[in-house]
Design a protein with these regions (language model features):
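ABC ATPase NBD coupling module
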Residues: 4-5
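Family-specific signature for flavin-dependent thymidylate synthase
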Residues: 1, 11-184
């Protein structure tokens, strides 16, 4: 006899074979605020559908303040990893250069708009750390796969933080499935 479909036991049995149809029937949409660089990584997950905030139509003041990226040292053993041991003096020097670059980029963007250049052209000078919003919709199965994959070692720190935030929302929205996956 099968357990009732709404019980944790059913969810647990289904999680063992999470590719089954039961996880294709429910979906979740999240708004994710990130940078253009990380959004490009997220958009590669093809089992989701996406809508990204268009900088083409945004006013320049809507683009937000560009935050300095967290500079880390390249891991010498794993090319997909970074370490938090960058020399503080090197970090400080590079951050000062980034501030100058980002300010110059924003000024050039604003000047291009004032000169009548189309926003779709002017946005090309904006840094990859310009903030953006994406709306990400996927099935329960897609979210399980994404969260497991992007919470794992080897994922860029900023992307991993997004995956962990997605896991938090997922556990609130799908508590029985999360319990079966031992995410709680």
């Amino acid at each position: 006899r099968r357990p009732p479909r709404s019980t944790p036991l059913y969810s647990s049995a289904a999680s063992d074979v999470y590719k089954r149809q039961v996880f294709e029937q429910s979906t979740m949409t999240l708004q994710i605020e990130t940078t253009r660089a990380i959004a490009a990584q997220i958009l590669r997950h093809r089992s989701f559908t996406f809508q990204e905030f268009s900088q083409r139509y945004a006013e320049s003041n809507e683009l937000g303040n560009i935050q300095l990226p967290d500079l880390r040292k390249q891991d010498k053993k794993n090319r997909q990893n970074s370490t938090d041991d960058l020399d503080p003096f090197v970090r400080q020097k590079l951050e000062a250069q980034m501030i100058t670059l980002f300010s110059s980029s924003q000024s050039l963007y604003n000047q291009m708009i004032q000169e009548g250049v189309a926003k779709e052209c002017a946005r090309m000078v904006l840094p990859l750390c310009t903030p953006t919003k994406i709306y990400m919709t996927g099935s329960c199965r897609s979210w399980i796969h994404y969260i497991n994959l992007r919470s794992a070692h080897g994922t860029q720190k900023e992307h991993m933080e997004i995956a962990e935030a997605c896991r938090k929302v997922f556990t609130e929205q799908f508590p029985s499935v999360s319990e079966a996956l031992e995410w709680e």
